Design a protein with these regions (language model features):
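Active-site-facing substrate-recognition patch
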Residues: 1-59
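Conserved hydrophobic/aromatic pocket- or pore-lining residues that grip, position, or stack substrates
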Residues: 27, 64, 91
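Glycine-centered small-residue hotspots that permit tight backbone geometry or close packing
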Residues: 45, 65-66, 100-102
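Short glycine-rich phosphate-binding loop at a beta-alpha junction
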Residues: 60-70
Length: 112
């Protein structure tokens, strides 16, 4: 498990962390910026994240979810890892705003 954690930290350092001048969503300036998407959207990074995060999902859980776009690869990876571990845990994706057409859902997926 420690090897997985170290490998993930290395990937985050190499692919997610940036040093420079950045304007944050708050409007503040920062010399540091972390964008985990290059890691969570890679096959290796997603597998490592899912492997490490599934340990924190309670045994009686039926779904994992999070806000789109950042959580999308994580919840899908965790759901897949759960399936291959013999557990039934679905993925849910939460929109920032309701979809403007069709069912106008805020939460996508098989809701419990």
């Amino acid at each position: 498990m420690e090897t997985h954690r170290k490998t993930l930290l290395h990937l985050l350092k190499e692919r997610a962390y940036k040093h420079g001048q950045f304007t944050l969503s708050s409007g503040k300036e920062s010399e540091h910026y972390i964008n985990c998407k290059p890691v969570t959207l890679s096959c290796e990074g997603n597998a490592l994240c899912s492997h490490l995060m599934i340990e924190h999902v309670e045994d009686n859980s039926v779904a994992v979810g999070g806000l789109t776009l950042g959580a999308d690869p994580l919840v899908c990876g965790i759901a897949q890892k759960a399936y291959y571990s013999g557990k039934h845990i679905d993925a849910l994706i939460v929109r920032k705003n309701p979809k403007g057409y069709g069912t106008k859902e805020v939460i996508e997926g098989n809701k419990p």
